[in-house]
Design a protein with these regions (language model features):
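Long, low-complexity, intrinsically disordered polar/charged segments
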Residues: 1-9, 64-80, 84
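Conserved nucleic-acid-binding Ia/Ib motif block in the N-terminal RecA-like helicase ATPase lobe
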Residues: 17-20, 24-27, 73-143, 148-151
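Short aromatic/basic micro-patch
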Residues: 32, 60, 129
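Walker A/P-loop NTP-binding motif
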Residues: 35-47, 58-72, 85-88, 92-97, ...
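The conserved Walker
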Residues: 51-55
Length: 155
């Protein structure tokens, strides 16, 4: 990182609750992908980013998503992942980032009873993370409504 880049999460103008959650997770400085992406996402720009595994890509989109979610209790962000394992991993990470906020995230994927997911979706979920097949199933059943989606992430 150069001296002109943001060096601490607090300097990225993040909510104190998010900075606190990141500190609890053991993170003090953003990775290069996070330092590059977070400000652009917070400014409302579309971002296409690529980085190696383990560089913090999930937090690069998860942090600004959590910061941008409003108190409205409807789905505001949709994150699509290719596998159920990644959906679970992303949901856990986003939930940790938003643990001090009132943001609710839910993974939806096949291989699990859909009824359980339908019930959970009624609990004011704001971020849904899922695999394409299960997301299509929910959309066709009208258990996921896309009316209020402000953010779409293809992971």
């Amino acid at each position: 990182m150069t001296n002109t880049q943001k060096e601490l999460f607090g300097e990225l103008l993040l909510d104190k609750k998010i900075v606190s959650a990141l500190t609890e997770m053991g993170f003090e400085e953003p990775s290069p992908i996070q330092a590059a992406a977070i400000p652009f996402v917070l400014e409302g720009h579309d971002v296409i980013a690529q980085a190696q595994t383990g560089t913090g890509k999930t937090a690069a989109f998860g942090i600004p998503l959590v910061q941008s979610i409003t108190d409205h209790r409807h789905i505001q962000a949709l994150i699509m992942t290719p596998t159920r394992e990644l959906a679970i991993q992303v949901a856990e990470e986003v939930s940790k980032i938003g643990r001090n906020s009132r943001v609710k995230a839910l993974p939806v994927y096949g291989g699990q009873p859909i009824e359980r997911q339908i019930k959970a979706l009624k609990n004011n979920v704001q971020i849904v993370i899922g695999t394409p097949g299960r997301l299509i199933d929910h959309i066709n059943r009208r258990t996921i409504k896309l009316d209020h989606i402000k953010f779409l992430v293809l992971d």
